[in-house]
Amino acid sequence: MHKRLFTIMSLAVIFAMLLAGCAQGGGGKTLKIVSSLPMTGASLTQTQTMVNAMQLRLDQAGGKVCGGDYTVTYEAWDDASAALGKWDPAVETENANKAAADKSIIAYLGTFNSGAAALSIPILNQAGPLAMISPANTYPGLTHAAAGLTEANEPDVYYPSGTRNYARVAATDDYQGPVAAKFLVSLGVKTVYILDDQEVYGKGVADSVNQAAVANGITVIAQEGFDTKAADYKALMTKISTSNGGGPPDAIYVGSIIDNNAAQVLKDKVAIMGDNTKVKFVGPDGIYTAALIEGAGVEVAEGVFATTPGLAKKDLGEAGKKFYADYEAKFGATNEPYAVMGYDAMNAAIKALEDVCAAGGDPSDRAAVTKAVFAIKDFAGALGTWSFDANGDITLPYFLIGQVQAGAFVDFGTFVP
């Protein structure tokens, strides 16, 4: 009887060990990387390519790090809600708290919206800290002070532990504004009317353009926030059409994400002031997406200019060109510029894990991984060779400018401030 019981118990132990082995993917522990991006709403056109690129990079690593001793899994979380049709503060806060509580998560790739990052950075900062790598945030105050653009308590307010845990592969709006302003000058623009969606990102980039436009001799007629839930903007556009001494400005700049009715703003601008050769329509990375063209219509969107962090495809090195070829082979071709940002965000996470192991550390140690992220220097990524500085900012202040031509954004070139 005792012998039979012993045999049954032994088999149970062996079975449990086999299950554990399967769960760990053939040896070693399992680590988890998550992304938190708006996967509901118009931004999906941009964010799906980032998620695809993140998965592509992990697949290229075979889902393993540290010589195969650790399995790495990836989950794409949505920080948007159907109710808002865009990123939702409540959902992003929930995501950050969920990640903080799950000790298997060693990197949080996000966010897409700067306002979302302002909520999640402090939560993750007190959870290890847990490394956060954004493929897209451009508001400077998340990492550094910028005169006239950031609040007095930024960025320290986001790091209650006193240790930095947030880095990003996107250049910031204190660079994006000057790039846009200098480009406007090159187009012969002398007067501009600036609109913003009143969010951290949209107002922030609009403020930067305002500041840079004045510095470059452009007259800013006004800057105002618009109601993102309005049915139309014909009254607003009618007002703007006579704001320049009875006539229209040379250009309208719209600091907004696509989810905040940017396509409707464009439609009503064209309806009241004519096509984009008459009064130029310019915006930032938040509208640099096929969703703008789909929402406004091909004819209406023709001629729109937009800036976005990164390099024109023709200016990418071999690693960047290989990324787009690999992406196309797996998911189909894309012109969304944030795809490569997603790839290098995952690149940075994998690099940090490998570096922790190479130093004899434990890649499940959040503090060690965070330290390794900030130690990334002269990394050969898809964007080129880059580093993270002490603030967590990427050392590539490059922006590409695109113009809508025949229903698609076409690279107009790479620009620096």
Q: For the regions a protein language model found, what residue spans apply to each?
A:
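Segments of small-molecule ligand-sensing domains
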Residues: 327-339, 350-411
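Beta-alpha junction/loop-to-helix N-cap segments that form part of ligand/metal-binding clefts
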Residues: 26-28, 45-49, 64-154, 169, ...
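Immediate post-signal peptide segment of exported/extracytoplasmic ligand-binding proteins
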Residues: 24-35, 65-71, 185-190
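Short, low-complexity disordered leader/linker segments with a strong preference
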Residues: 1-32, 66, 100, 416-417
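Extracytoplasmic ligand/sensor domains, especially the bilobed periplasmic-binding protein
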Residues: 106-224, 280-302
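Periplasmic-binding protein-like
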Residues: 35, 99-112, 130-135, 193-196, ...
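Extracytoplasmic "Venus flytrap"
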Residues: 34-57, 61, 65, 77-89, ...
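Extracellular/periplasmic periplasmic-binding protein-like sensory domains
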Residues: 147, 266-343, 411-416
